[in-house]
């Protein structure tokens, strides 16, 4: 009975256990609070750094883009300022190249296939506008060759230059003068077709034709005669040019017939208009190159002897350009 009434024997252990729990609760709470605060502070710092980084990128990008645009604009203006004259001369020469429709070319051979463009590798349609390169007598789609000539100043097939040199012009005009009395009213025009290159030997009938390599294809020039009326010729963008009664025959024979046909075309009063303009522009280009070479030699040479030699060379180049113009006027009777 006394043990039940007086619980002093087991009550001491219970009191010690409860007191230890009470002493542990504040320390645990403090540790948990410290951890939570550390976590919150670290997360806040991360978000703050990310926001600052985004703001800095937003402020730097407009400045860099504006500076790069200003640099590119100034460079383009500087280079465009230096290239005004060549680009203008180049565009004027391109505009002087003749344009005609493929339907205006009549083929004398009934077994002849339709021609193909060597740039886009597609067939010529009757209503397609073709542009002719007079120095090599190759014809292409006007849009195709215009895009090609923006970055390449040569023929896509034979790689002959668009802007002829003094020697090329003198050679062509000299042969023109010797063959002017032939009376053959013809102008050579090379139009061919695309053929996939094979491993087998080329047949003899194809070997007789003129063949050009275009990657994995061969461009075979048709060995037939064609005829085109001069009234179907347009010069550059002048689609309403005055028509004439003369005709220009397109011949795809050997290369030596080009000069004879060119002589006949020059001798014809009606068909020499666009060719005269083309040669005049080339002559002006030769004279401008001679003047630029002369000015650079005068300002950047160190000795008087060197300047005298350059002056003689410049006079010879200018004289060659004048001879070309005079020879052309004499041949055409201007």
UniProtKB/Swiss-Prot annotation:
GO cellular component, one term: membrane
Zn finger spans (RING-type): 117-159
Pfam families per UniProt: zf-RING_2
PROSITE patterns (UniProt xref): ZF_RING_2
Record field: catalytic activity: S-ubiquitinyl-[E2 ubiquitin-conjugating enzyme]-L-cysteine + [acceptor protein]-L-lysine = [E2 ubiquitin-conjugating enzyme]-L-cysteine + N(6)-ubiquitinyl-[acceptor protein]-L-lysine
Chief location category: membrane
Pathway the protein takes part in: Protein modification; protein ubiquitination
Keywords linked to the UniProt accession: Membrane, Metal-binding, Transferase, Transmembrane, Transmembrane helix, Ubl conjugation pathway, Zinc, Zinc-finger
Database matches in InterPro entries: Znf_RING, Znf_RING/FYVE/PHD
Region (Disordered): 1-20
Transmembrane annotation, as ranges: 28-48
Keyword Membrane: yes
GO biological process assignments: protein ubiquitination
Intracellular or extracellular location(s): Membrane
SMART domains: RING
Bilayer disposition of the protein: Single-pass membrane protein
Family statement drawn from the similarity comment of this UniProt entry: Belongs to the RING-type zinc finger family. ATL subfamily.
Notes concerning its domains: The RING-type zinc finger domain mediates binding to an E2 ubiquitin-conjugating enzyme.
UniProt function note: E3 ubiquitin-protein ligase able to catalyze polyubiquitination with ubiquitin-conjugating enzyme E2 UBC8 in vitro.
Annotated protein name in UniProt: E3 ubiquitin-protein ligase ATL4
Gene it is expressed from: ATL4
């Amino acid at each position: 009975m006394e043990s039940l009434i007086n619980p002093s024997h087991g009550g001491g252990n219970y009191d010690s256990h409860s007191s230890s729990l009470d002493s542990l609760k504040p320390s645990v709470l403090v540790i948990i609070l410290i951890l939570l605060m550390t976590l919150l502070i670290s997360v806040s710092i991360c978000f703050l750094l990310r926001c600052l980084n985004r703001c800095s990128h937003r402020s730097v990008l407009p400045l860099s883009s504006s500076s790069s645009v200003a640099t590119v604009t100034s460079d383009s203006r500087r280079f465009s300022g230096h290239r005004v004259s060549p680009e203008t001369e180049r565009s004027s020469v391109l505009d002087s190249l003749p344009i005609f429709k493929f339907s205006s070319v009549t083929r004398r051979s009934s077994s002849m296939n339709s021609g193909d463009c060597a740039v886009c590798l597609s067939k010529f349609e009757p209503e397609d506008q073709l542009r002719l390169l007079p120095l090599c007598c190759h014809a292409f789609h006007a849009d195709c060759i215009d895009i090609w000539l923006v970055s390449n100043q040569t023929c896509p097939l034979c790689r002959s230059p668009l802007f002829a040199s003094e020697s090329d012009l003198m050679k062509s005009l000299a042969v023109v003068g010797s063959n002017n009395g032939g009376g053959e009213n013809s102008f050579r025009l090379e139009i061919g077709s695309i053929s996939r290159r094979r491993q087998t030997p080329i047949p003899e009938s194809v070997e007789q034709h003129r063949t050009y390599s275009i990657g994995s294809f061969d461009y075979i020039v048709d060995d037939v005669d064609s005829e085109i009326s001069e009234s179907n010729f347009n010069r550059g963008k002048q689609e309403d040019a005055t028509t004439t009664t003369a005709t220009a025959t397109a011949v795809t024979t050997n290369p030596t017939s080009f000069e004879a046909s060119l002589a006949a075309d020059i001798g014809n009063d009606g068909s020499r208009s666009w060719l005269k303009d083309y040669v005049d522009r080339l002559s002006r280009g030769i004279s401008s190159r001679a003047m630029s070479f002369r000015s650079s030699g005068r300002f950047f040479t160190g000795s008087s002897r060197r300047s005298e030699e350059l002056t003689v060379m410049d006079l010879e180049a200018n004289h060659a350009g004048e001879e070309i113009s005079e020879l052309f006027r004499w041949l055409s009777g201007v």
